[in-house]
Amino acid sequence: MIWKRHLTLDELNATSQNTLVAHLGIVYTRLGDEVLEAEMPVDARTHQPFGLLHGGASAALAETLGSMAGYLMTRDGQCVVGTELNATHHRAVSQGKVRGVCLPLHLGRQNQSWEITLFDEQGRRCCTCRLGTAVMG
């Protein structure tokens, strides 16, 4: 297991109370040896005006996953901040849920890179993101 902090899924989800994460309905669903996953509903909260998943909502899910994964890689007295987010949208989603899968690309002492892939309910890739974070403290 790569994580330096050990939290349960319930504890991870509790951190989202009264935040954008909760407003968008994002729920952490899996914390594996080197993977963090979450789901987000595709509904009125996350739609753009034409009834499709808003790219900004996809980006919010990606940044949520990458930032929390980055936090889990820090020690006491440290935190992470996002420095760059890139998102490539591959396929439209109009309903259901999307699942985000976050994996490390680089875990340095001062910076990290994460790949976050979003999948629709049929398991099709709908968005690929990369998040860069800086380790502070």
From Swiss-Prot:
<dbReference type="InterPro" id="IPR003736">
    <property type="entry name" value="PAAI_dom"/>
</dbReference>
<dbReference type="InterPro" id="IPR006683">
    <property type="entry name" value="Thioestr_dom"/>
</dbReference>
<dbReference type="GO" id="GO:0005829">
    <property type="term" value="C:cytosol"/>
</dbReference>
<dbReference type="GO" id="GO:0009239">
    <property type="term" value="P:enterobactin biosynthetic process"/>
</dbReference>
<keyword id="KW-0963">Cytoplasm</keyword>
<protein>
    <recommendedName>
        <fullName>Proofreading thioesterase EntH</fullName>
        <ecNumber>3.1.2.-</ecNumber>
    </recommendedName>
</protein>
<comment type="subunit">
    <text>Homotetramer. Dimer of dimers. Interacts specifically with the aryl carrier protein (ArCP) domain of EntB.</text>
</comment>
<comment type="function">
    <text>Required for optimal enterobactin synthesis. Acts as a proofreading enzyme that prevents EntB misacylation by hydrolyzing the thioester bound existing between EntB and wrongly charged molecules.</text>
</comment>
<dbReference type="InterPro" id="IPR026576">
    <property type="entry name" value="Thioesterase_EntH"/>
</dbReference>
<comment type="similarity">
    <text>Belongs to the thioesterase PaaI family.</text>
</comment>
<keyword id="KW-0378">Hydrolase</keyword>
<feature type="active site" description="Nucleophile or proton acceptor">
    <location>
        <position position="63"/>
    </location>
</feature>
<dbReference type="GO" id="GO:0061522">
    <property type="term" value="F:1,4-dihydroxy-2-naphthoyl-CoA thioesterase activity"/>
</dbReference>
<comment type="pathway">
    <text>Siderophore biosynthesis; enterobactin biosynthesis.</text>
</comment>
<dbReference type="InterPro" id="IPR029069">
    <property type="entry name" value="HotDog_dom_sf"/>
</dbReference>
<dbReference type="Pfam" id="PF03061">
    <property type="entry name" value="4HBT"/>
</dbReference>
